[in-house]
């Protein structure tokens, strides 16, 4: 088997209308940004282990890890757009460090692409119940972001080239890496230092496996009905 690489580049933003759940009871943005990506990697591990140069890349928010709500890491009780971003970011880095520890021949890359010139913010819509002030505020934010993207945003083509570089370069060997918008390693551990010491790589992985088991059980029940 030749060179293997998994790249996930699914830009997502949390809903402004509140938590929108899948049929398994999981919040949609959480699924797209974390659970679905990790599940795909998990399912592909047997193939990746046969590759001479296995590499996994998740384009999300590497290096921007924040503290978790440690008693509610699935955000069943404390969901908010900011919490989803923070949790999926930190949990991705913890999951990749766990996977790298268990698969010492693999490279796991969690990258932050920076501000890229896409229409992701332009597609933000206010809740139907929003008042005039919130609608005007959101329109202002969309306009401001559009200007920022035009002035300092990275072209989509360059962003794609940078991610392709990460998948093919020899700079980042086996292990778990956090990569910034300049395609450089993020060295400062931030909140990860404490989480490593407290065993959160394993605790996060155990939580993730429980979520998978529950989701698969619900899916099986739906199919059998």
What is the meaning of each model-derived region?
Residues 1-126:
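Rossmann-fold NAD(P)H-dependent dehydrogenase/reductase core
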Residues 69-225:
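NAD(P)H-dependent oxidoreductase Rossmann-fold/reductase module
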